[in-house]
Swiss-Prot record:
Superkingdom classification of source: Eukaryota
Coiled coil: 70-153
Protein name as catalogued: Autophagy protein 16
Species whose genome carries this gene: Aspergillus fumigatus (strain ATCC MYA-4609 / CBS 101355 / FGSC A1100 / Af293)
Biological function: Stabilizes the atg5-atg12 conjugate which is necessary for autophagy. The atg5-atg12/atg16 complex is required for efficient promotion of ATG8-conjugation to phosphatidylethanolamine and ATG8 localization to the pre-autophagosomal structure (PAS). Also recruits atg3 to the PAS. Involved in endoplasmic reticulum-specific autophagic process and is essential for the survival of cells subjected to severe ER stress.
Similarity field: Belongs to the ATG16 family.
Length: 172
């Protein structure tokens, strides 16, 4: 009954590990989407799209949205984070692929070893049964020989008794 619980728990733990391995990608994706939306707002400020009555701010005043260098720096930071996460995931993939290959080889070796052990066990059992059969046949032949000897001695004794009775009946 506890077997299925163990399998279920193991499956949940494996799922959690997979999801936690991709947290960096999820965070990078969220940041990229935020930057993209911020970049679109910044582009509206720079191009002057929007309401015609909105005045373009003077050169001394800062824009309400982030500046282009800030957006560019944030995008570069996110790109480097995404590349770092990608390289980590690639390294993890390589590591897991290597481990998978090792496990496959080990599984193949274990299967062969199990087959060899089963064959040896079968041969041992066969040898044991043959030995028991030989011992039973020897016992049977010994008992038959003893039985024949007993019958021969009994027949000889009965024959002597019959002759003795015959000899005794001649004089009566």
């Amino acid at each position: 009954m506890a077997h299925w619980r163990n399998e279920y728990s193991a499956a949940l733990a494996a799922r959690d590990r997979r999801e936690k391995a991709n947290v960096a990608l999820y965070n990078a994706s969220d940041r990229t989407s935020r930057i993209a939306s911020t970049g679109a707002q910044g582009a509206q400020y720079l191009t002057g799209t929007g309401d015609k009555h909105t005045a373009i701010p003077a050169a001394g005043k800062s824009l309400a949205g982030p500046s282009v260098p800030d957006i560019l720096a944030a995008t570069r930071a996110d790109l480097s984070e995404a590349q770092r996460a990608r390289s980590e995931l690639q390294a993890r993939l390589t590591e897991l692929s290597t481990e998978l290959e090792k496990l496959r080889k080990r599984s193949t070796q274990d299967s062969r070893r199990i087959h060899v052990l089963e064959s040896e066990d079968f041969q041992d059992e066969l040898a044991s049964l043959n030995l028991q059969l030989n011992m039973a046949e020897e016992r049977s032949s010994r008992l038959q020989r003893e039985n024949r000897e007993l019958i021969d001695r009994w027949m000889a004794r009965i024959g002597r008794e019959a002759e003795a009775m015959n000899d005794a009946s001649k004089f009566s």
